[in-house]
Design a protein with these regions (language model features):
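Cytosolic juxtamembrane N-terminal segments of multi-pass membrane proteins
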Residues: 1-9
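Canonical alpha-helical transmembrane segments of integral membrane proteins
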Residues: 10-34
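Post-HEXXH active-site segment of zinc metalloproteases
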Residues: 146-174
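Hydrophobic alpha-helical transmembrane segments
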Residues: 27-49
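An active-site-proximal "capping" alpha-helix that borders the catalytic cofactor pocket
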Residues: 81-84, 138, 187-208
């Protein structure tokens, strides 16, 4: 009983802090109510709280995605049913697809009755091996017990809102938010590790490990690269009709694979306020059963109507851009040059010139490299991207590191490309190849310079004669 009371108190505190405007308004109306006395004094704060709750319910989105009936995709339906049986689910499961690489289990009302709905991202159906998809499905279905607990759902929603509020206005007190999030994080992580074990029991440890790694890679790729492709193309009045084929091609690029692994590791290392609901990937992989490596068929689950489902996903992504119908022209991203979907190098040049107050690109790059050694790079990054200043204190420096590494890495790569170097990856501007020598990732080099305070290796590259190395 004491544990339940503690959990309820934690949930209540998290929920209150996650809604500062509602909480403040309730306190104010309660104070006014004390002055009014009697019935009015009780009804006023109750009414204010009711308005806040009603507004929160109204803002709650409906189920995402497109429904996929079992008869439309029998192989997928058979996979879900078999995995459900293996984990002892015992309830019908509806499936919906979404355009992004994500998976979740929900229990909304469908036709007046609570129904389990499994949401699967189209990239998972298209790019994961069948055993890996089985592991993903098993992991999500293993969360059934949490969905039937009103207390857990309340805690989960409050955590999500509180974590999101760290980067929004009105600003939530970050230190207090961190203490509340940290108090409930261990429970969330334990549930995720238990779901990982369930997925390993169903699909095998090798497939479970592969699923964890590939879903994390896909998530980083979509968040950091694919979203940028879409935005840049939209700015040119276009939309990539072969987006998912391009994603598959990018995943086969070893430089993209390395960048995605580094992004995942960096993002997971950055959790000063305990906002992450999932343990780091390395911990999840280490917690899986230790067995000899085993191979499995890399083929994905057969999809009867891949064209129709993919076209729906592309339309949904297009709708999210809020572009007027017919204003974006479809184009084949894989047949286009990098300038069609990657930000132009001159944008990095311009951002550095403005941030450093210099007139020439070479002077701006030199000033930026100086900042890596004198410690002024955080302020420089805030000038490049002012939104960094508005982040909570413990998030500001890592965000500045990310912003400046991206901007300066592209700028240095651009200067080297002007001197006869070549792109080593069509997906990453900062990865370049000298006329003779090894491929270099300038973003990694700039990051290393920030961490060490030594920009000498980057300066040495810029000092090389044209065509050298």
């Amino acid at each position: 009983m004491r544990g339940r009371a503690k959990s309820a108190a934690l949930t209540a505190a998290t929920a209150v802090l996650a809604r500062p405007v509602l909480a403040a308004g309730t306190l104010v109306t309660l104070a006014v109510g004390v002055l009014l006395h009697r019935l009015q004094g009780v009804l006023l704060p109750v009414a204010w709280g009711g308005v806040g709750v009603a507004a929160a319910i109204a803002r709650r989105p409906g189920m995402p995605g497109r429904p996929v009936p079992p008869e439309a995709e029998p192989d997928l339906a058979e996979l879900v049913a078999r995995v459900a049986s293996a984990v002892g689910f015992g309830q019908p499961v509806l499936v919906r697809i979404v355009p992004e690489p994500t998976a979740s289990l929900a229990r909304p009302r469908v036709a007046g009755a609570r129904t389990y709905v499994l949401v699967l991202g189209w990239p998972f159906l298209r790019l994961l091996a069948r055993p890996e998809l089985e592991a993903v499905v098993a992991h999500e279905l293993a969360h059934r017990a949490e969905l039937t607990s009103a207390a857990f759902r309340a805690l989960s929603r409050s955590r999500e809102r509180l974590a999101g509020g760290l980067e929004r206005r009105p600003r939530i007190p970050a230190a207090l938010a961190g203490r509340l999030l940290r108090a409930s994080q261990a429970r969330m992580w334990a549930l995720e590790l238990a779901a990982d074990r369930a997925s390993a029991e169903v699909a095998g440890p090798a497939a479970a490990s592969g699923a964890l790694t590939r879903t994390a890679t896909l998530g980083a790729l979509f968040e950091r690269l694919v979203a940028g492709w879409i935005d840049v193309a939209a700015g040119r009045g276009r939309f990539p009709e072969d987006l998912y084929e391009a994603v598959a091609d990018a995943l086969a690029d070893p430089h993209v694979q390395r960048r995605a692994r580094l992004l995942v590791a960096d993002d997971e290392a950055l959790d000063p306020y305990a906002a992450a609901d999932h343990p780091p990937l390395r911990d999840r992989l280490a917690a899986l059963p230790m067995v000899p490596p085993a191979g499995y068929d890399p083929a994905p689950v057969p999809i009867r109507d891949p064209v129709g489902l993919e076209e729906w996903c592309l339309r949904d992504l297009l709708d999210q851009l809020d572009a007027a119908p017919g204003t974006l022209e479809p184009f084949a991203l894989r047949d286009a040059g990098p300038n069609a979907y990657l930000p132009p190098v001159w944008e990095a040049y311009s951002a550095l010139r403005v941030a450093t107050g210099t007139r020439s690109t070479d002077a701006a790059v030199a000033a930026a490299l100086d900042s890596l050694e004198d410690g002024g790079w955080v302020g420089l990054a805030e000038s490049v991207e002012p939104a960094v200043r508005r982040l909570p204190p413990l998030l500001r420096r890592p965000a500045a590191r990310d912003v400046l590494a991206g901007c300066l890495g592209v700028a240095v790569a651009g200067r080297l490309l002007d001197r006869g170097w070549r792109r080593a990856s069509r997906w990453l501007t900062s990865v370049v190849r000298p006329p003779a020598g090894e491929v270099l990732d300038l973003q990694e080099m700039v990051t290393a310079a920030m961490d060490s305070g030594d920009a000498g290796p980057v300066r040495d590259l810029l000092a090389l004669p044209t065509g050298a190395r």
